């Protein structure tokens, strides 16, 4: 990247290279502009102005809301419920330019009554298969409990859409780096052997790790530009040469020859 940017500043016959030119990663996040837009309980209540949207799904307590908040660099954008399974709506967050992030209801919490769970499942099924603006699914999985029965069920619902799935293995900070990478490689192999076209990565909301990798994927889905790195040109240091004061040597007096 640095080489490409430097190429935009060719040296001329009377031009010196910029002093100490380097890139400083931007503190801006891809979803930095996200703001709550609307909650919908039916397909008819979804925004009609949407051009592209990405949906976040995950088992209750897998860290979905925390992942959204981390990606948006916002502590309270997505509500982190103390009672898992209580979010029953599709929550839309406006990213600007008619792009949206959609927080889907959490699933797989045993204490949710079947009468409450059934409408969620119908809504999720319709949304994932019928929503043309949906460009891809971000599936949140706790790295310690990946591919639960409920995760598999959701993936089977989504598969007929033919749209991409990117899996965030959250809470990777709960394992050592070696252990987390071993889990990642094992799961990637299992997915590859099964012929499933999923991509996946490690992610930690606590350590804020994995953000750049996730943003690369989601920016491509939404056709959004990534935040540009800041081009930093520090001031040229000033060097002042110290003047050396020389004292004229006094000629030695000749001794009289006597």
What residues fall within each predicted segment?
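Switch II of P-loop NTPase G domains
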Residues: 46, 84-91, 105-135, 143-157
């Amino acid at each position: 990247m640095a080489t490409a940017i430097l190429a935009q500043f060719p040296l001329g016959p009377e031009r010196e290279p910029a002093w100490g030119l380097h890139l400083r990663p931007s503190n801006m996040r891809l979803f930095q502009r996200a703001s709550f837009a609307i909650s919908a309980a039916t397909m008819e209540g979804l925004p009609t102005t949407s051009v592209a949207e990405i949906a976040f799904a995950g088992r209750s307590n897998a860290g979905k809301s925390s992942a959204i908040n981390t990606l948006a660099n916002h502590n309270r954008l997505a509500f982190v419920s103390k009672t898992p399974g209580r979010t029953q709506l599709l929550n839309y967050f406006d990213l600007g330019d008619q792009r949206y992030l959609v927080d889907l209801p959490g699933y797989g919490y045993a204490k949710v009554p079947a009468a409450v769970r059934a409408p969620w499942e119908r809504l999720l099924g319709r949304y994932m298969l019928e929503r043309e603006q949906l460009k891809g699914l971000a599936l949140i999985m706790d790295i310690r409990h990946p591919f639960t029965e409920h995760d598999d069920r959701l993936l089977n619902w989504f598969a007929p859409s033919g749209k991409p799935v990117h899996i965030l293995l959250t809470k990777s900070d709960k394992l050592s780096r070696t252990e987390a990478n071993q889990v990642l490689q094992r799961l990637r192999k299992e997915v590859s052997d099964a012929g499933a076209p999923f991509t996946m990565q490690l992610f930690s909301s606590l350590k804020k790790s994995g953000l750049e990798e996730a943003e690369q994927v989601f920016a491509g889905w939404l056709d959004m530009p990534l935040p540009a790195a800041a081009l930093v040109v520090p001031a040229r240091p000033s060097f002042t040469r110290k003047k050396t004061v020389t004292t004229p040597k006094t000629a030695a007096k000749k001794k009289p020859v006597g």
